[in-house]
């Protein structure tokens, strides 16, 4: 699973969904998702990340679906910050 970035309609806020792997086990199983959120001040600069939290996979999927329904769109612009 790779990292997904969503941006709102006004292009002022972003949320980044990335897998959180359990490093204590030998198998690289994904059991949670790290959701980071931040603000975009200029399109040409890096976003300012305000915080992050860890959610279960189901809770993260539900939030992802709700954001898409609210008009957020997937973007690749900020994947390398």
Segments (PLM) and residue ranges:
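Terminus-proximal functional modules
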Residues: 1-66, 75-81
């Amino acid at each position: 699973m790779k990292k997904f970035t969503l941006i709102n309609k006004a292009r002022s806020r972003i949320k980044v969904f990335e897998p959180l792997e359990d490093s204590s086990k030998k198998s690289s199983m994904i059991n949670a998702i790290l959701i980071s959120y931040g603000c975009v001040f200029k399109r040409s600069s890096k976003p300012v990340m305000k915080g992050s939290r860890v959610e279960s996979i189901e809770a993260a999927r539900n939030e992802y679906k709700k954001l898409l329904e609210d008009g957020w769109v997937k973007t690749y612009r900020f994947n390398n910050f």
